[in-house]
Regions:
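C-terminal motif of bacterial Sec signal peptides marking the signal peptidase cleavage site
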Residues: 33-35
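Sec-dependent signal peptide hydrophobic core
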Residues: 27-28
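Compositionally biased, low-complexity flexible segments
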Residues: 1-24
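Bacterial signal peptide processing site
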Residues: 37-39
Length: 500
């Protein structure tokens, strides 16, 4: 198992304190790290920080761009969901099954749409109800046609029937992302009317049904997947990666909580290293530095590992963001267009699988793959994913905003669609060959033709967290998230004053 296994599974299975007055306000946002920090370690152990956070006026400088990206990304989830069951396609416009992780991001997007005025609270309430009612159907045994078992769901479902797609696995991380969205809705929809009360009840039932203990095939770790045909797969969730949110929810469960030793086991495989001037926990694709932060505000709170390092996980993601930008500026492999405003490697689509000669140099390219760059691993074929940079907006707005603007200027309509940023582009790949996805634009390279739900999700959520902290503030009030963080040993900041 391990972080590498996480990347492999994701690729193969599917293929600072901010202040705001609410949506639409035009005010100066001082994006700085939270003041509440653990004491710094001794000078000899003190890691080199990323450049100090800059004062960035999000609304005055980039309000229209953020509005445009946020609204179009919201429309991916709102317009493409199946109105009968709430399922959201894994990708579009290519024909697609549903991704349960994308459904979790959709559940997170709907309240954002309410606060931004895209839809009414009643419209969002009804959409969430449709979705949660579908998932709350009995899912006790892995029967043919079922969506899940033991409170967990299959990675991909048929968009129309909701049945398991082909032979995909019951997925712990994808169920986790779905449950995170459900718990966000549970806390957000807090009014006494019958519909909102039902949302709270359904989310409660779904979360309580998740049998985390059954997944401890190699205790105290949690397995990544299981199928009735082959049983548990070979990988467990070991850090550092997107599995943080999984263990927070597994530890916070009121019915089937894993022991606190699970967090210690998860963090035992952490790798702290230096990469392009930054010292931080290594994980190559940026999605692993985003996903848990969509729902959990890690500013100013730390577990035992981070207390020893003298930072928090928010700062860690900030450093990972700067390191990836540093890698793109250095551009050791000579990919076209890489630079201070064109950067960002993550799991995403790509042009083709195979080796090709480009301008006299042999190059290897991938289709969907967990791209990334770190001291631990570099997997890079010249393909940039907009979600990689945009998902880091709360961490490093001073470098993310120029990247967003550059992607708009440089790529224009070739990278931006009705539903926001297309998934990826590769300026180096300019060959006229048959492609699975996307197209080659002469003089500009390859551009994807699809948006992917699990890449659109962090875009809308992290833009909103940077602008208003909506998801963070809401989830600070969720008792299960609070309990999970405390059982993992987190202290400090907002967590110390959260209700017990």
């Amino acid at each position: 198992g391990g972080a590498g296994g996480a990347s492999a599974l994701r690729a193969s299975g599917r293929r600072r304190e901010v202040s705001a007055r609410g949506p639409g306000s035009s005010l100066l946002l001082l994006l700085v790290l939270a003041a509440c920090r653990p004491a710094s370690p001794p000078a000899a152990a003190r890691p080199a920080p990323a450049p100090p956070p800059a004062v960035v006026s999000l609304e005055e400088r980039a309000g229209p761009l953020l509005d445009l990206v946020e609204k179009r990304t919201f429309d991916y989830f709102w317009e493409l969901a199946n109105l009968k069951n709430g399922l959201v396609p894994d990708r579009s416009p290519s024909p697609s099954f549903s991704s349960i992780a994308a459904v979790g991001f959709a559940l997170t997007a709907y309240p954002i749409g309410v606060e931004r005025g895209y839809v009414t609270r009643q419209q969002a309430r009804d959409r969430v109800l449709t979705t949660l009612r579908f998932f709350a159907r009995p899912a006790g045994a892995p029967e043919p046609g079922a969506a899940g078992a033991r409170g967990f769901f299959y990675h991909f479902l048929d968009m129309e029937t909701g049945a398991r797609f082909e032979k995909v696995e019951l997925s712990t991380i994808d169920t986790t992302l779905f449950l995170a969205g459900a718990l966000f809705c549970q806390t957000y929809f807090d009014r006494p009317d019958a519909g909102e009360a039902e949302i709270r009840d359904l989310a409660e039932r779904l979360y309580r049904a998740a049998d985390w203990l059954w997944w401890q095939h190699h205790p105290p770790l949690v397995s990544m997947g299981w199928t009735s045909e082959e049983g548990f797969n070979e990988w467990d969730w070991r850090g550092y990666n997107e599995g943080m949110i999984l263990y927070v929810l597994a530890l916070g469960s009121p019915t089937h909580p894993v022991p606190a030793s699970a967090w210690e086991a998860y963090t035992r495989t952490y790798e702290w290293n230096r990469f392009y001037g930054q010292e931080y926990l290594q994980f190559a694709p940026l999605f692993g530095h985003h996903y848990s932060h969509v729902w959990v505000d890690f500013r100013g709170i730390s577990d035992r590992y981070m207390r020893a390092r003298g930072i928090d996980y928010f700062e860690n993601s900030r450093r990972a963001t700067y390191a990836q930008r540093g890698y793109a500026v250095a551009n050791p492999n000579g990919w076209k267009a890489y630079g201070e405003n064109v950067w960002g490697l993550s799991a995403c689509d790509g042009p083709i699988d195979g080796d090709f000669e480009i301008e006299g140099r042999k190059r290897h390219f991938f289709t969907y793959a967990a791209r990334g760059a770190s001291a631990k691993e570099v997997r890079d074929d010249g393909t940039i994913a907009p979600t990689a940079a945009v998902g880091s907006l709360p961490f490093a707005p001073e470098i993310v905003l120029p990247a967003m603007e550059e992607m708009q200027r440089w790529a224009g309509g070739r990278l931006f669609s009705r539903y926001g940023f297309l998934d990826a582009f590769n300026p180096t790949f300019a060959l006229s060959v048959s492609l699975k996805h996307g197209k080659v634009v002469p003089g500009a390279g390859w551009f994807d033709s699809d948006c992917l739900g699990i890449d659109q999700g962090p875009i809308i959520a992290m833009i909103e967290n940077a602008r208003s902290e909506l998801v963070w503030k809401t989830m600070r009030r969720n008792p299960y998230v609070v309990a999970g963080l405390r059982r993992a040993g987190f202290t400090g900041g907002w967590l110390d004053s959260a209700p017990r």
